[in-house]
Amino acid sequence: MPIFGQDDFDTEVLLEGCQLAGLQVIEYTPRRADANSVIPTLRGRFPEAVIVAGSTIDDENVIRQMQQKFPQLMSIAQLAPFVDGFVSMLPYSDATLQAYSPTHLCIPTAQTGGEALRQVGKGAAFIKVLGPDFSFSKNLHATPTFGYCPTYITGGVTRERMPEAFAAGNVLCAAGFDVVLKGENPETITPERVAALLCAFVESAKAARAAVNPQLSRLEELTDEEFLAVLPNYCSVI
């Protein structure tokens, strides 16, 4: 999953590249200054894709104050009509998970096992873990946890590190365009080049995940019942 964060690349070039690549999911964050104008348009541009808002904060008082400095910030309530899910580098409260998990994918961060268990139990679809170190992922997937926790990892997950990321137990990974397009010139890159590099990332991720969880390599062919049966983790989205 590509993450629209803060970088020097042109938004329109990146969006066109995502369209050419036929991506099934994208994450757009308010770290990008145009987020409050772009996020409401994404469903129209990507009608078949899952649209996720990243870098969310589930405290409206904090959002209101920080909007003075970062006017592109939107609360979860403001984002909800335009997206299919939310990601955060922070935990979510029980109230947020109970309010939004029935209708949206909720992917908060945890930094302890207890924090992860609480949030999954309240409806989190995945727990976000922060790379590039995989120690916490491995702890969450240790034998005594019975592999309950579905984890999504970001941060330094290059194509070369994907096998290690999935071997640590993660079932999803994402990267910002600073990683996906590393070494590319923002002034000259084309949508076609963006699409080619995105497709290479997607194929590397699929291959790395299939090596660890081969039962997940043909998800589009499974019924809902078969899908739930092959998942390696607990599923709160039922």
Enumerate the language-model features and the residues they cover.
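Conserved N-terminal beta1-alpha1 strand-loop-helix module at the mouth
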Residues: 1-65, 159, 188-206, 225-238
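Catalytic beta/alpha-barrel core
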Residues: 2-4, 24-33, 50-58, 65-92, ...
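Short, well-ordered alpha-helical microsegments
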Residues: 11, 35-39, 93-97, 113-117, ...
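Acidic (Asp/Glu)-rich catalytic clusters
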Residues: 13-20, 36-47, 76-81, 98-101, ...
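Surface-exposed amphipathic alpha-helices with a cationic face
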Residues: 19, 39-46, 93-103, 120, ...
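Catalytic cores of alpha/beta
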Residues: 60-81, 114-123, 139, 157-173, ...
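Glycine-rich phosphate-binding active-site loops on the catalytic face of alpha/beta enzymes
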Residues: 79-95, 129-138, 169-197
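C-terminal helical cap(s) of enzyme catalytic domains, especially alpha/beta-barrels
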Residues: 97-105, 146, 166, 181-237
